[in-house]
Amino acid sequence: MARTADDSWDPASSVGATATMVAAGRAAASADPDPLINDPYAEPLVRAVGLSFFTKMLDGELDLSQFADGSPERVQAMIDGMAVRTRFFDDCCGTSTTAGITQVVILASGLDARAYRLGWPAGTVVYELDQPAVIEFKTRTLAGLGAHPTATHRPVPIDLREDWPAALHAAGFDASRPTAWLAEGLLIYLPPEAQDQLFDRITALSAPGSTIATEYAPGIIDFDDEKARAMSAPMREMGLDIDMPSLVYAGTRSHVMDYLAGQGWEVTGVPRRELFTRYGRPLPPEAGDTDPLGEIVYVSAHRPQ
């Protein structure tokens, strides 16, 4: 189903299902014999969503031979990819709070459990913004698991296409204080103009000393949805009745690093393969034709004093 300007979702549908997919990846990465991350809530959250494709993935019941490259090496590279991505954003949180930032905003938080699993310094406030159905599901499920936030946790149930800055302020956000912003796995699901608006709003809300962690997928400019649809066909054949490529907004858009630099941020980009080296993981195959989004660049930015 094509995206619309006012579409909504829960963790089992549309864009929400991609959050469940990412959580399943975090669960697999956490179960690795030599884990880079530890997300004890990823697996129970995925199971609570109840999409059979992802529960079978957790149970090792998927027939990987149906995928174009379901070799053990390729599967491990995918698990490692989720591990290094998660660790990058975890480390950005740690670097920001070590520098004295006590206000963290996670945009489109999905099934992210950082407010519960990271060791936040005393006095840290973590705001999470996402669709109301996603926020309600995660908060209720984690409470049922007996999980407790490790920081002051302020969920903000709102669509990011609405006036989320006003909702953030209403939840207690203080724009006069530096903020650590996380926008993980979000940008490809925004139209190009909405991506610019997102960073305009972040900049307007960011005191000097604030930070941003996000990523940029260069392949989104000439994203081939038919190729992506063919690559994801086995997922549909195994029961995941969601057309993942239709959720993405392709086409020309601002380069995240250039756009943020133009807004006065000091920006650093790290290609995904460099993250593998940083965290001691074997280099994955070059993206080439195997990844319609190309080689993702992980971006961190700092607003100077």
Swiss-Prot record:
Domain of life: Bacteria
Keyword Disulfide bond in record: no
GO process terms (BP): methylation
Pfam families in the cross-refs: LCM
InterPro entries xrefs: Ppm1/Ppm2/Tcmp, SAM-dependent_MTases_sf, SAM_mthyl_Trfase_ML2640-like
Keyword match Cytoplasm: no
Alphabetically ordered keywords of this record: Methyltransferase, S-adenosyl-L-methionine, Transferase
Enzyme Commission no: 2.1.1.-
Protein's job: Exhibits S-adenosyl-L-methionine-dependent methyltransferase activity.
Homology family: Belongs to the UPF0677 family.
Name this protein carries in UniProt: Putative S-adenosyl-L-methionine-dependent methyltransferase Mvan_1344
Organism (species): Mycolicibacterium vanbaalenii (strain DSM 7251 / JCM 13017 / BCRC 16820 / KCTC 9966 / NRRL B-24157 / PYR-1) (Mycobacterium vanbaalenii)
